[in-house]
Amino acid sequence: MATDQHSNKSNVSAARKPLSPSPTASAAGLIKINGSPIELVEPEILRFKAFEPILLLGKSRFAGVDMRIRVKGGGHTSQIYAIRQSIAKALVAFYQKYVDEQSKKEIKDILVRYDRTLLVADPRRCEPKKFGGRGARARFQKSYR
């Protein structure tokens, strides 16, 4: 059984997943996040954000794929966004490697049409602090007298 490693970073939260074809072709796609099923993702309000790639593409496309995602760092929201992006990117990579190019392109088009951030990472990072002030851009107050 072959596995592929994919990783994704959203601001400070990082999601890594080994992706493997299911041992049985008829098995439903197993998606676990930190050892628990995706249906139990907390907080409940953000659960459907993690489900977006599955709801967009349908369960049938995930049937032959097992995903075990480890996510750490950041807050609840950035972790959920890292999870959803890693699921989408892994499925596209799986279809490119194990299925055909046409199916991969079809999946990619559906995901990009819905939300481009499912496949493209947000490049913004925290700017480092500089001297002469309390933050990256803020300066200490200047007195003339």
Curated annotation (Swiss-Prot):
Keyword check for Cell inner membrane: no
Cited InterPro entries: Ribosomal_Su5_D2-typ_SF, Ribosomal_uS9, Ribosomal_uS9_CS, Ribsml_uS5_D2-typ_fold_subgr
Swiss-Prot/TrEMBL GO biological process terms: maturation of SSU-rRNA from tricistronic rRNA transcript (SSU-rRNA, 5.8S rRNA, LSU-rRNA); translation
Residue ranges of the region described as Disordered: 1-24
Localization of this protein: Cytoplasm
Top-rank taxon, per record: Eukaryota
MF (Gene Ontology): RNA binding; structural constituent of ribosome
One Pfam family, short name: Ribosomal_S9
GO CC terms: cytosolic small ribosomal subunit
Name of protein: Small ribosomal subunit protein uS9
